[in-house]
Amino acid sequence: MTALPVIDIGPLLTMDDAAAIERTAGTIGAASADHGFFYVEGHGIADALFERLEAASHAFFALSEAEKARIAMVHGGTAWRGWFPLGGELTSGRPDRKEGLYLGEDLGADDPRVAAGWPLHGANLWPDGLPELRGAVEDYLAAAVAAAEALMRGMALALGLAADHFATGITRRPTLLFRIFHYPPGGVADDLGVGEHSDYGLLTLLGQDAHGGLEVRAADGSWIAVPPRGRALVVNIGDMFERLTRGRFRSAPHRVINASGRERLSWPLFYDPDFAASVDPLPIPATTRLLSRWDGGDVHGASGTYGDYLIGKVGKVFPELAGKALGDFG
């Protein structure tokens, strides 16, 4: 593999051309099985919205450390929201060379999930004096979720299921996590902005600025660059989709090395199962191509809810926060 497939998902947004829907779903299914990564165009997110988000993100990371620390993750409690400093996240057991802002579906205290004390559910933390950040994030998140829902329709059809199979099941109330990551300039070839990992949930929809650094590990073990392609999103399959499909869809390892000499921004949306859902494999044949995972883990042998799986993962990313924020859930 030298380049990822490029897929226009417009037909899955409008759902008004049966032949185009079938073709698009088939292409998504093939890309998910062969690569686990692909570019998405026709996603419905306007260029102007990307520009607003990029400008607001730069403005946030230009704030002083003291200003950003006012909304540090330690203040986010079980919601797991807020800012973390450079080196504050350990994706694969060593500090990543990035800082970031953890966000998600903005839920008030009256939401049943928040009232029940569910981790990773709650209110976002926003900096004072930067209202454009909240506006840009909320508008972008709404558009990106619509694109994710369209992709999930395509995934269902590719698997021979009804288009609304997931929307009426494990993503009826999805876990929505959104991040803004800032990679400073000055990295070198072996300086990992994000260490090798796979994503935990169903789908990741990644927006990125013009400075590359993302790499995906191909099935043959080689690393393939995933450079920006205009405002196309990069979509990848997560662990739970690999589990659901009995290995048919591939949750591919990936990493970030920012060796561009310039700062880099990215905006991943993690579109994941309902926190309380049991992610049981679909009644389809298991692939004969089950490969050893990069981390030695076994998503196919996992048990419990998606929340159980997710908490077990995020507690390793922020070990110092895990005990305080996750409490009895950790």
Where do the language-model regions lie?
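Peripheral, non-catalytic segments flanking oxidoreductase cores
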Residues: M1-G330
